Amino acid sequence: MPSVTQRLRDPDINPCLSESDASTRCLDENNYDRERCSTYFLRYKNCRRFWNSIVMQRRKNGVKPFMPTAAERDEILRAVGNMPY
């Protein structure tokens, strides 16, 4: 597996791995009919938007690493109360 692909499959790097997998699985199950999977795509897009805002906030505050680890993301989601996307 190429290193870029491995990085994208790493839960510490990609916070939206489950959303990405769900949208790909939907495409596979629905014969690549994009209209049927639009809710999955929207959820993935909202996930990326949410975590990007967290990265920007951490960068602004000088917190490193900019992308929280998987454990930190779980804490953030618990603090929010539920998945905001």
Swiss-Prot record:
UniProt cross-references to Gene3D superfamilies, sorted A to Z: CytochromE C oxidase copper chaperone (1.10.287.1130)
UniProt keyword terms in alphabetical order: Chromosomal rearrangement, Disulfide bond, Mitochondrion
Keyword field contains Ligase: no
Record-linked SUPFAM superfamilies: Cysteine alpha-hairpin motif
A Pfam family hit: COX6B
InterPro entries according to UniProt: COX23, COX6B-like, Cys_alpha_HP_mot_SF
Motif, Cx9C motif 1: chain positions: 16-26
Subcellular location: Mitochondrion intermembrane space
Any one GO biological process: mitochondrial respiratory chain complex assembly
Similarity comment: family membership: Belongs to the CHCHD7 family.
Name by which UniProt lists this protein: Coiled-coil-helix-coiled-coil-helix domain-containing protein 7
